């Protein structure tokens, strides 16, 4: 679950759902940004950020704007990723926030298209490997 590349007949998945910090999120988003196809970042909360929670998530929002076409954020704190992307002028039709991974899974087929490159990254406790399993079914 650390930068594992999964290619199936629908999409390419970059599974990095094991751990997350602002630096590792930015690094993973830069890798996503190198791809030519439409890029989707599925990003969950980063835990144990303390008083830096909002700032750290906003840094990720800026990096997402620079490296992706669609942002899907999951979790309470990931709302700051979305807010930063909106503040920077990212197309609001391509910003989606869900409170839980289950809510995201309900909508994911509408948001992810054939041949997309999809990054899945969050702190381990978010259990976003369930999203990877769903996308790879």
Where are these regions (language model features)?
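ATP-dependent carboxylate-amine ligase
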Residues: 1-137
